[in-house]
Swiss-Prot record:
GO terms for biological process: riboflavin biosynthetic process. GO terms for molecular function: 5-amino-6-(5-phosphoribosylamino)uracil reductase activity; NADP binding. Homodimer. Keywords: NADP, Oxidoreductase, Riboflavin biosynthesis. This is 2,5-diamino-6-ribosylamino-4(3H)-pyrimidinone 5'-phosphate reductase. Belongs to the HTP reductase family. It comes from the Eukaryota. It catalyses: 2,5-diamino-6-(1-D-ribitylamino)pyrimidin-4(3H)-one 5'-phosphate + NADP(+) = 2,5-diamino-6-(1-D-ribosylamino)pyrimidin-4(3H)-one 5'-phosphate + NADPH + H(+); 2,5-diamino-6-(1-D-ribitylamino)pyrimidin-4(3H)-one 5'-phosphate + NAD(+) = 2,5-diamino-6-(1-D-ribosylamino)pyrimidin-4(3H)-one 5'-phosphate + NADH + H(+). Catalyzes an early step in riboflavin biosynthesis, the NADPH-dependent reduction of the ribose side chain of 2,5-diamino-6-ribosylamino-4(3H)-pyrimidinone 5'-phosphate, yielding 2,5-diamino-6-ribitylamino-4(3H)-pyrimidinone 5'-phosphate. The gene is RIB7. It comes from Eremothecium gossypii (strain ATCC 10895 / CBS 109.51 / FGSC 9923 / NRRL Y-1056). Pathway: Cofactor biosynthesis; riboflavin biosynthesis. SUPFAM superfamilies: Dihydrofolate reductase-like. NADP(+) binds at T78, D82, L163, G186, A187, E188, V189, L190.
Length: 246
């Protein structure tokens, strides 16, 4: 399905929150957290279930953001549940006109336990068509299987299986030359990074006009989080919040 045109007033709201060129002292990429949630802060009806929350207007926005980032990061749970393509279908010429590998961000899959496979995925399918890039897979040690076409980035994890976020983004910047990364999920990843104003530069959150219920997967960090430089956009049925971690 073709994307609908991006609203100009939405593009204007997003402009101050888009990646900026790094200066010579930069060690980290520009990091944007972006996701869609329901009115009760759920991003899925239940764990492992793909759930549509946002309107077509904000779907176009997602691809617009992908166009402006060099990497796109998700956890393995999201990769397994949704089998996303993680490519970009928006271009300045015309929405969806020239979906290419060059215009798409580099997929980054956090797969500490080695659950996800590139072969047979939508990411592989789109890469083979020349419409998306091959992924970087982040592992907690030496991967059991090394798949052709995949770049692997090994990181140590703590006793709870959590990654060192600072080291991860430093290495994505220095070793893979990614100057900007958008993080799309899942909940565990978002909840941890919402507590890292030292890493996260921008937030773009879509709020859909629905409730998903108490069984849904919530984005709710362990501590209070305040935002600053907040702007809102209101569409047909969604609202978009743009801001920065205080």
């Amino acid at each position: 399905m073709a994307l609908i045109p991006l609203s100009q007033d939405l593009a204007d709201i997003l402009a101050p929150y888009l990646p900026t060129p790094p200066d010579s002292s930069a060690r980290l990429p520009f990091v944007t957290l972006t996701y869609a949630q329901s009115l009760d802060a759920r991003i899925a009806k239940q764990k492992g279930e793909r759930t549509v929350i946002s309107h077509e207007e904000t779907k176009t926005m997602t691809h617009y953001l992908r166009y402006h980032h060099s990497g796109i990061l998700i956890g393995s749970g999201t990769a397994l549940a949704d089998d996303p393509g993680l490519n970009c279908r928006w271009t300045p010429a015309a929405d969806g006109a020239d979906c290419t590998e060059q215009s798409s961000p580099r997929p980054i899959i956090l797969d500490v336990r080695g659950r996800w496979r590139y072969r047979g995925s939508k990411i592989e399918y789109l890469h083979n068509l020349g419409k998306g890039k091959a992924p970087i897979v982040v592992t907690g040690g030496e991967p059991e299987v090394r798949e052709l076409g995949v770049s692997y980035l090994q990181l140590g994890v703590d006793e709870g299986g959590r990654l060192n976020w600072g080291e991860l983004f430093e290495r994505l910047y220095s070793e893979h030359h990614l100057e900007s990364v958008m993080v799309e999920g899942g909940a565990e990843v978002l909840n941890q990074l919402l507590l890292r104003p030292d890493i996260v530069d921008s937030l773009v959150i879509t709020i859909g006009s629905k409730f998903l219920g108490s069984l849904g997967v919530a984005v709710s960090p362990a501590e209070e989080v305040n935002l600053e430089h907040v702007n809102w956009w209101h569409g047909t049925s969604d609202s978009v919040l743009c801001g920065r971690l205080a």
